[in-house]
Amino acid sequence: RAFLRADPDVIMIGEMRDKETADIAIEASLTGHLVFSTIHTNSAVETVVRLLDLGCDPFNFSDAMLGVLAMRLCKRICPNCREAYHPTRSEYDELVQAFGEGDWEGVHPAYNPGLTLFRGRGCDTCNQTGYRGRVPIHELMVVSDSMKALIQARARTGELLTLAKSDGMRTLVQDGIEKVLQGLTTYKQVRAVAIK
C-alpha cells in the first residue's frame, strides 16, 4: 500500500500468493497504475481461475486485467551439432494432433517428402546432449470485452480457453510446436514443459 502513496506509474509485485496481495494489485490497476506480477499456474487461462479462487471480486478483477502471459523455457537444440531429419508419419501426426488439427490446416505444410525437422546429434560443445541454452515458449491472453464478461460470470477454464483461442491466442503447446518447426527445439522438450 505504501507504493500507492508514492504515485508510481508502474508497480511490480513479486508474486501473488494470497487474496490481500491480489486485491492490492487490482486496486492499484483500477487507480491507473500499470501492475505486473507473477503467479504459478499451468497456463494463462488457469491464472484467471486461480485468482478468482483466491477470492478476488470478478468484476474489479476483469476491469483491472489487460492480459496474462504464460511462459516456459525449453532446451534449445545445440547450434553446433544441429542436424535436419525427415520425421516419420507418426511424429508428424503427433505434432498435428497436439497443435490442433483445425488450427494446423492451411497454416502448416501437409506431410511430404521435403518436410524437415531438427535434432541435436551431440557434440563436445553440448556435452553430447544435443542441447545448449534455452528457448522460451509463450502464451499471451489479451482480455477482450467478451473475456471480461466470461470472467465476471466465473466461466470454467474450458470456456475461457475457447474464447481466448477464438480471440487469437496461441497456446504454449502451439507456440512450442512453432519453435519445433523453426528448428529451435524438439517436440520432446515442448511436451516436457508444456503438456501436463
Which residues make up each language-model segment?
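Short, flexible helix-loop junctions that flank or precede catalytic/ligand sites
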Residues: R1-K196
